[in-house]
Amino acid sequence: MITLQAMMSALSLPESVRQLLNPVMNQPFGQFVVDSRQVGQGDVFVLLKSQNVTDSIDLEKVAGYLAQVADKAAFVLSEIDVSALQSQFMLPIIYLPSIRDFLGSLIQTSLQQQHPTKLPAVIAVTGTNGKTTVSQLVAQLISQSGIKTAVMGTAGNGVLGEKGQPNLIPSTHTTLEVFNLHHAIDDFAKQGVQALAIEASSHGLHQQRLQGVPVNVAIFTNLSRDHLDYHTDMDDYAQAKARLFDKAHFPTLTHAIINLDDEFSELMIEAANASHLTVWTYSLTNDQADFFAKTILPSLQGGDLTIALSKAVTPQGKLTVNSPLLGRFNVANLLASIA
C-alpha cells in the first residue's frame, strides 16, 4: 500500500491539483486502475471520459461503473463531474477534469514507490508510415551493441532475444492505454531492459497515453492523409504529432530526429527548437541534412547506401550500409534508425 502524500515529492503537480487531492492524500491504496472491472480491494479507480468525440456522457452508465467499485475502491479520481451521483456512493470521489495531464506520472510514480527500478531510455517514433519498421530497426541496432532492448508497437510488445529478434506479445493498440503502457514499461524495467523503442501514434499522443513516459529521443518519419475520421484536419493531425517534440509534455527529451523531406518537418523542427532539443535531420534529397543518402545502389538483394554525415553528428564524414531492405521508403527508415 502507498499514499499520495508519499508520492508528492516525486511529482510536479500544480498547487490547485494538490489542494483537490487533500481529502485523500493520506488514504492508503494499492494501484491506479482505469477499468472498473479490474479494480481490486483498496485500489484507486480512475474514471475517464470516452475519447470518442461523438460520445456524450451517460450518467446512468457512469453510475454503473461506480457501483462496480463502491465496495472495493479506496477512492475515485474522476475526469467526469459526478456531483449529481455523489450521494449514492459512500466513497470519496475527487473531480479532476485535467487528470490526463498527470495520470501517467501518477501511475509511474506509484509503481516506482512500491517497487523501485531503473527505467529504460525511451526512443519514441511517430509518423503516418514507418513507425513499426523504424522502431524495430532501432531496437535491433541498440540490441546489437549489447544493450538489453525492448520494442512496443503495432507488431507487438516484447524484449529482444540474444540474436536481436523480439519475442512479441500481440498488442491491442499501436500505443497502449496509459495504465497498460506504464505497467508494461515497469515489467521491462524489472527484466533489466535498458532501452525501449516505442511507436507513438497520433491517437496515443492526443489522448496523452504516453504522459509520464521518460522519452529521451523522438523520431518523426512522415505525415500523410490518414486518421481524419479522428482528427479534424491535417493541421490537427500534425499538431498531435508535434506534441512528441515538446518538453512541456516530455521533460526528459534530449534529441529529435526529423525527416527533412516531409512537408511537416518544419513544424516538428520548430517544436523541437522551442524545447531546446538537439535536432538531427535526415533526407534522401537534401544534402544539408545531418544524415543524407548520398548514394543508393539498389539490387534484388536490397542495396548499398552511403550516408553523408554532418559535422554536428560526427567528424567521420560518411557511413556505408548494406541492407536487405527494398525500396526508397526503407532507405528513409534506415536513415531514421541510424540517426
Predicted segment positions?
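Fold-independent oxyanion-binding glycine-rich loops
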Residues: D35, L48-S50, E79-I80, L96-I99, ...
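Structural motif corresponding to alpha-helix initiation and N-cap regions
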Residues: L59-A63, V178, H182, D290
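Glycine-rich, charged/polar anion/phosphate-binding loops
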Residues: G30-F32, H203-H206, F291-F292
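Acidic, Mg2+-coordinating active-site environments of NTP-dependent enzymes
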Residues: V82-S87, V217-A339
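Short, conserved beta-strand segments within well-ordered enzyme catalytic domains
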Residues: V44-L47, L77, A197, I257, ...
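Active-site regions of enzymes building and remodeling cell-envelope glycoconjugates
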Residues: S87-S98, Q165-T172, H276-W280, F292
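N-terminal leader/targeting and accessory segments in enzymes
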Residues: M1-T109, E263, T295-L297, N322, ...
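Phosphate-binding loop of NTP-binding sites
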Residues: F102-L260, F264-L277
